[in-house]
Each structure stands twice: as C-alpha cells, then as structure tokens.
C-alpha cells in the first residue's frame, strides 16, 4: 500500500524538524499510541491500538528514524505485531520551506498489513492510512504551534 501526502506546518524547517523528531511530540501525535518510549539512539518502542472498520487491534512494535539529513529529510521505519496480524512500513519525510514561517512536509512511502486486518479491510486500508496521516499531522501541528509559542515567550 502506498503512503503519500503533503502537510503544511506553521513554522520554519528548523522548528518543524526538532518537533517532528521530539519523542514527546511524537508520542502525542501518533494516532492510537498508548506508549512510546526511547530504545536507544533514534529508535523507540510503541504500543498502539488501530481500528479498521469494526476490527480493533493492539500492536507492539518499533519505530526507527534513519537517513537523517538535518532540517531536510529523514526516513521513518515502523514494524509491529499483534494478535490480529502484523504491520510494517517506511516513509521518507522531506521538509521544504514554502514561505517564512511555513514548512511543507512531504511523505512518500509504503506499508503492509498482514493478518485479519488485511483480509477484512483490504479495500479500506488506503483510506485508513490517509486518515491516520491526517490525524498525525493535525496533532503535530498543535505540537509545532506550542513550540513556536514557547520560543516567542522566551
């Protein structure tokens, strides 16, 4: 399944970069995340709950940030397993300043889901992936706005 999209965030690339890679901001932004903990450099363990149609699944997995080009791009690699299947994927996040105080984050990647979710919700998975990305960046926008506000108060 292809994963792609572009999302505007209200800050310069340096601020967006630091918030996107901040463990606390990630924990607050990942839809369905129940826990998100560092596991060494640029790696995290995550427990999350995902719903597709009427099926809900809990997954435990790992998130790795790789191929970092500071304030420009990075790759996010995700793996998870649960009682109802497994999920994996990777995506390249590219940051571009479109005007002062505004950064576009473009996401290009692929994901796979195996097990019950894949069998029951195959037709819906693309839509679900887009919805989850929209939720993630909506949550991340709030984290970026809080960071900008905190910096202005200093």
Give short role names for the model-derived ranges.
Residues 116-154:
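A conserved amphipathic terminal alpha-helix motif
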Residues 12, 41, 70-71, 98-101:
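Short strand-connecting beta-turns/loops that link adjacent beta-strands
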Residues 5, 34, 61-67, 78, ...:
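Hydrophobic/aromatic beta-strand elements that line small-molecule binding cavities or substrate pockets
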Residues 16, 20, 26, 65, ...:
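Hydrophobic pocket/interface hotspot
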Residues 2-8, 43-45, 58-60, 73, ...:
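Intrinsic-disorder/low-complexity, polar/charged segments enriched in Ser/Thr/Lys/Arg/Asp/Glu/Gln
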Residues 1-51, 146, 153-154:
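Hydrophobic ligand-binding cavity/cleft-lining segments
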Residues 37-79, 135:
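Glycine-rich portal/gate segments that line the openings of hydrophobic small-molecule binding cavities
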Residues 79-127:
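Beta-strand/loop substructures that line and gate deep hydrophobic ligand-binding cavities in soluble
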């Amino acid at each position: 399944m292809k994963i792609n999209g572009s999302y505007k965030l209200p800050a310069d690339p340096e601020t967006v970069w630091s918030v996107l890679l901040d463990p606390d901001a990630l924990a607050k932004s990942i839809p369905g995340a129940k826990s998100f903990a560092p596991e060494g450099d640029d790696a995290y363990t995550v427990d999350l709950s995902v719903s597709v149609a009427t099926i809900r699944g809990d997954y435990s997995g790992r998130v790795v940030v790789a191929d970092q080009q500071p304030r420009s791009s990075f790759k996010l690699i995700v793996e998870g397993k649960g009682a109802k299947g497994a999920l994996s994927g990777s995506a390249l996040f590219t940051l571009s300043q479109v005007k002062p105080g505004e950064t576009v984050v473009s996401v290009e990647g692929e994901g796979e889901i195996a097990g019950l979710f894949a069998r029951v919700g195959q037709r819906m998975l693309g839509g679900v992936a887009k919805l989850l990305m929209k939720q993630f960046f909506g949550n991340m926008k709030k984290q970026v706005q809080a960071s900008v506000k905190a910096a202005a108060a200093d």
